[in-house]
């Protein structure tokens, strides 16, 4: 009798909040993964040299925003897919994703605020179902501005431990010339891409197109814009996770971005790396090209 009650009401039981139905096992997984995410951040706080909570409330606020970000990503996925498994999956991945957890708990990175704003914008668009060129440009331009805002390398280096293309040549040589030229190059290419999109007579704006655009600009700017810091991959990690949830064949995008981001964290804190850093720069460029092709395909639909 008790076994049957537990099976029917807990293991196989379902609950409803409004239109959202979820199973007891979904709730159990969400609670457990949230607890694991908290413990991950607590462990990162204990790393030698990390001020953790002693550094003030700023780092704690960023860690709380990690969970807000994960919830917003789950809301966006629910509003665009209504797939319960994908909702639980994206939340679970986001709260324990190493690049996201490390950005806040290890680096105290302000970038999570940018990510929260962009995903909140996606949620508003998804809830109101206003997929049009105005909302597309709004998201794309904000993503571009937020990604550029992450550049804070010292004036004598073209990158702050982030594998952009300048690691292929010289991080310190001709930094004044490359600095100006790199900025003009990025702005010029972005304007050409935007001009091409604006001239298309018919563009079907979809959630997939919005995510593809956000991923492309975040990857492109982080790869070619000078003075990027070692935390510059957060937005690409977030958009990469959303793209993977939308298209399982893109599983390699968030995985590769997570590796690149964590290598950058390690390079910054250790001052050395076991593999040539320029190899990760090539990987970043390949991911950017792949994202560009995917964006082009979405524009043709």
What are the functions of these language-model segments?
Residues 115, 125-141, 213-215:
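Short hydrophobic alpha-helices at membrane interfaces in multi-pass membrane enzymes
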């Amino acid at each position: 009798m008790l076994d049957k009650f537990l099976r029917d009401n807990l293991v196989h039981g379902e609950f409803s909040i409004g239109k959202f139905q979820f199973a007891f096992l979904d709730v159990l997984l969400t609670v457990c993964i949230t607890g694991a995410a908290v413990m991950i951040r607590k462990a990162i706080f204990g790393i030698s040299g990390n001020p953790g909570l002693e550094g003030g409330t700023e780092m704690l606020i960023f860690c709380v925003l990690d969970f807000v970000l994960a919830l917003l990503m789950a809301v966006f996925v629910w509003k665009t897919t209504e797939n319960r498994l994908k909702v639980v999956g994206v939340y679970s991945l986001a709260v324990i994703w190493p690049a996201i957890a490390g950005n806040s708990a290890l680096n105290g990175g302000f970038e999570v605020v940018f990510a929260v704003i962009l995903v909140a914008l996606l949620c508003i668009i998804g809830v109101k179902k206003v997929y049009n060129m105005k909302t597309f440009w709004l998201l794309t331009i904000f993503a571009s501005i937020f990604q550029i805002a992450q550049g804070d390398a010292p004036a004598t280096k073209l990158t702050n431990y982030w594998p952009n293309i300048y690691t292929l040549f010289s991080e310190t040589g001709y930094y004044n010339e490359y600095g100006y030229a790199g900025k003009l190059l990025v702005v010029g290419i972005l304007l050409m891409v935007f001009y091409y999109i604006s001239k298309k007579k018919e563009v079907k704006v979809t959630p997939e197109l919005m995510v593809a655009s956000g991923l492309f600009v975040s990857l492109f700017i982080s790869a070619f814009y000078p003075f990027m810091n070692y935390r510059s991959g957060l937005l690409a990690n977030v958009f990469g996770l959303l793209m993977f949830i939308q298209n399982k064949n893109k599983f390699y995008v968030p995985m590769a971005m997570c590796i690149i981001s964590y290598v950058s964290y390690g390079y910054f804190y250790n001052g050395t790396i076991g593999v040539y850093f320029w190899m990760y720069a090539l990987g970043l460029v390949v991911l950017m090209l792949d994202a560009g092709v995917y964006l082009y395909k979405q524009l043709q639909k």
